[in-house]
């Protein structure tokens, strides 16, 4: 497969994206991922996750499998941290491109009512490389993505090479149960917590802690969990 590398494209929130905050126009903005329109609902969905993520002022965080970065946009609506740099990383140029990332920023800055306090850039990766320097990052996230990747050992190995020793990797997944072993959206097999810990241990990570079901819904068909791992 041909490797697409677009480099890092930096967007400073609050300029052209925020100028599109007119509500009617924002409704038409196209991007991939979450499209929350209610701040109260967004807060209920993300505040427990934010507490677990422990983002600090000045952090740089790589979001692997980000699509158009909507998770990052959503948490920036309610977050209190400042001067955090988010690197969006995905293989799908149909979702991760300048237009859709700017649309995502415009949507969530309009919902927030002001520009983000943080910066966002993106990197389009390939199957065999994240296109980030070795041992360059301290923090990395992967949300609802690992179950979709055929070569799980390969992507874990790639993330390990980019993270510094002692670096943190947070992985979120809907976990398989006896009754529900397939993801309802992508129709790919879900993983179990045991499998996840085994794969990460083999890839050079130690399990630290986790949080289960941080999303307040009445009925969760599969447990949604965030796992924190530390690179050895």
Regions found by a protein language model. Give the residues of each.
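Bacterial Sec-dependent N-terminal signal peptides
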Residues: 1-21
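A short SAM/SAH-binding and catalytic strip from SAM-dependent methyltransferases
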Residues: 137-152
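A short glycine-rich, Lys/Arg-flanked "PGG" loop and its adjoining helix->strand segment in the class I
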Residues: 153-168
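Class I SAM-dependent methyltransferase SAM/SAH-binding core
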Residues: 62-130
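Glycine-rich helix-loop-beta junction characteristic of Rossmann-like nucleotide cofactor-binding loops
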Residues: 50-56, 78, 130
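C-terminal alpha-helical "lid/dimerization" subdomain adjacent to the S-adenosyl-L-methionine
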Residues: 21-29, 33-34, 122, 167-228
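Class I SAM-dependent methyltransferase Rossmann-like catalytic core
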Residues: 20-53
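Glycine-centered, small-residue-biased loops immediately flanking beta-strands
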Residues: 59, 84, 167
């Amino acid at each position: 497969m041909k490797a697409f590398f677009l480099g890092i494209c930096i967007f400073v929130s609050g300029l052209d994206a925020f100028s599109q905050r007119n509500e009617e126009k924002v409704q038409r903005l196209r991007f991939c991922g979450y499209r929350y329109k209610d701040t109260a609902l967004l807060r209920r969905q993300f505040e427990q996750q934010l507490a677990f993520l422990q983002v600090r002022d000045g952090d740089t965080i790589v979001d692997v499998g980000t699509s158009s970065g909507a998770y990052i946009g959503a948490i920036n609506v309610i977050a209190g941290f400042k001067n955090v740099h988010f690197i969006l990383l995905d293989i799908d140029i149909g979702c991760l491109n300048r237009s859709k990332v700017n649309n995502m920023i415009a949507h969530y800055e309009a919902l927030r009512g002001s520009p983000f306090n943080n910066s966002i850039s993106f990197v389009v990766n390939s199957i065999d490389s994240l296109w980030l320097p070795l041992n360059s990052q301290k923090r990395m996230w992967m949300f609802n993505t690992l179950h979709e990747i055929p070569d799980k050992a390969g992507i874990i190995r790639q993330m390990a090479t980019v993270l510094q020793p002692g670096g943190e990797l947070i992985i979120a997944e809907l976990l398989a149960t006896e009754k529900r072993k397939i993801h309802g959206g992508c129709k790919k097999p879900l993983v179990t917590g045991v499998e996840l810990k085994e794969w990460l241990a083999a890839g050079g990570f130690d399990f630290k802690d986790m949080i289960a079901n941080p999303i307040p819904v009445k009925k969760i068909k599969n447990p949604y969990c965030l796992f924190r791992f530390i690179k050895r």
